[in-house]
């Protein structure tokens, strides 16, 4: 995942 975008792992 990209830095700052770990919340997009769904």
UniProtKB/Swiss-Prot annotation:
Its main location: secreted. GO terms for biological process: neuropeptide signaling pathway. One of its GO terms (cellular component) is extracellular region. Coiled coil: none annotated. Keywords: Amidation, Neuropeptide, Secreted. The modification Phenylalanine amide is found at residue 10. It is found in: Secreted. Disulfide bonds: none annotated. It comes from the Eukaryota. Expressed in the CNS and thoracic perisympathetic organs (tPSO) but not in the ring gland, midgut or abdominal perisympathetic organs (aPSO) (at protein level). Belongs to the FARP (FMRFamide related peptide) family. FMRFamides and FMRFamide-like peptides are neuropeptides. This is FMRFamide-like neuropeptide SAPGQDFMRF-amide.
